[in-house]
Amino acid sequence: MKKSTIQIGLLFTLCLVSIGCQSHSVQMTSGKKYLSGYTSHGSTDANASDLNEEVKAMASIEPSIQFPARIGLVKLFNGRITNLTVDEVEAWEESRAVMGSQFGDFIPVSPMVAEMVYTPKSTHGKSKTSPSDIFRKVRLGAARQHLDHVLIYEVFSETKTTKLASSVANWTIIGGYFVPSREIKTTGFANALLLDVRNGYPYGTASATLNAKEFSASQTYRDKSRNLADKNLVSTVIKLIPEVQKMMKKLMEESKQA
């Protein structure tokens, strides 16, 4: 009930919300079984041979997920680990309660812990952090907190502002502050990936999008645009959580059969 209240409250803070989309998938396939069908073509090309060995190395991992589990939560924004909002923490906790004690716990991975244990491979100060470096940092931070698996979710948005016919009011001092002359549209995106901390096995993915729009006067549309995008991002995460929940339930069922 509390989760529904959080979600409804967030959505109503957005003036107009349209439905986006949601999806999820799970993986529990065996690396050993996958490689049993792997045949060598006897290529004399050194580059092809190296690639074949790399493919084998990437495939040779096994699923080992068991419940209850300690599952870390990592939120990525602008390529960095960031703190969860209060609304997100409450929503994740509600999801954990719905799945019951047989699920385990969601535990946020501390950005400070991740930074403490991570050492960049490159010593160049201006080198850009690559996606592989980010995943490495996440797994190291989660390992230091003794977590079994880690759910990484990244959020970002696209925002567009359009002038309306009423923008003629911008020619007046008062009208520029009070007459709605801009339409702000924003789309929030949230993508999640569940990884095994120990071997990097990808157990599942989930995604969600959410559209929102608002009208604003010309003198205030920049602030309103930022505020709308921020609120919509949190609402997009709230919309992502049910998909993660479905993914987790499937994994709980499949882990019992493994």
Predicted segments with their positions:
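Bacterial N-terminal signal peptides that target proteins for export
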Residues: 1-9
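A general structural signal for short secondary-structure junctions and capping/turn motifs
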Residues: 2, 62-64, 141-143
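Hydrophobic helical h-region of N-terminal Sec-dependent signal peptides
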Residues: 10-15
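C-terminal motif of bacterial Sec signal peptides marking the signal peptidase cleavage site
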Residues: 17-20
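C-terminal/domain-edge helix-coil "capping" segments
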Residues: 22, 26-65, 157-160, 180-258
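N-terminal post-signal-peptidase region of extra-cytosolic proteins
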Residues: 50-59, 131-139, 169-179
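N-terminal segment of the mature soluble domain
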Residues: 67-160
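Short helix-loop boundary/capping segments
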Residues: 164-168
